[in-house]
Amino acid sequence: PNIRKGYLDQHATLDGSKTIMEYLMGAFDYLFDLEKRLDALYESMGELSGEELDKAIAKSSRMQETLDREGFYDLDAKVKKVASGLGVNFLGYDTLISRLSGGERVKVMLTKLLLSELDIMLLDEPTNFLDIEHIDWLIKYLNGFEKTYMVISHDTKFLNAVSKFIVGIENGNIKKYSGNYDKYLVQHEMNEKQYREDYE
């Protein structure tokens, strides 16, 4: 299967000539590409007939269904919903990326990553530049996210709110714990105690 994945890279270089809205809309490039291919298919139908025309009609129907299912005709509202959740709306959608501070760019990158609705997301310190209300929004978003995400964070309150598993590196090994950060601490302490007893 074609697994779509992405990573919040806080040091990524962005195209400063784009506005915030143009950059965020880039999350849907695959849909804009699909629309172009659908338009080209419609144009070609005038030269088709019989079985070839039937196949083209069926294909165009599937493509149109994909656009409808993905909310292609409501992208503006979709972008603004996520952007406002993370406070990006206050930056101004027509603001050039080049005018943003480092922290503001990270917020914009996080917004685009969420809009991309990937199969796997890796979020590196996603709360670094967010206000409390925007962190709360992100918590609700991730708790409703039906696909896979991994979070690297020093914000233990945030980890408690969004974690279903904790992965730790212990004694040179990678270990997976069920539950949130508080549960991890309890299990980790028990394991450390057992480890010390085994080697005494």
Name every feature range the model reports, one short phrase each.
Residues P1-Y199:
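ABC ATP-binding cassette signature C-motif
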